[in-house]
Amino acid sequence: MSIIVVRARSDVTVERSIRETMSHLNLTRVNHAVIIPENPQYKGMLQKAKDYITWGNADAELIEKMISERGRLIGDKPVTDADVKSSTSFGTIKDFAKAIASGDATVKDMPELKRVFRLHPPRGPKGWGGLKRTYVIGGALGPRGDDIGALVERMI
């Protein structure tokens, strides 16, 4: 399984250890997203930065859309099927996305692909929905489960 993590808040006046945790996750700016594997080390990092990020389970279609529309290679070039085929054992972006979603591959398996996806702020009348409250009580922060897809769709 893989997890999509999106940074929702700035790190101004934030404790140093939390700022470093977000840096280790490669979330250096607001509206940046990363795809990480699900393991205990990352779970601890997510829990530490829970007041500044939101995360949820990644599915193959969402990962495919993120890579094809917002994924960038070194030099700020868009990702194509030919790039995926030349640098990985997968033939298309769709196959690569399925492998990432199932946990058989990571974004690091394609060395030229930047690990951070630069997204738009959430479009629509709701926006983030409250940056000071958790998702469970109507805000934007913390774990979302499968509902992360709706947020990322509005940000792509």
Locate each region found by the language model.
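Core subunits and conserved enzymes of cellular information-processing
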Residues: 1-156
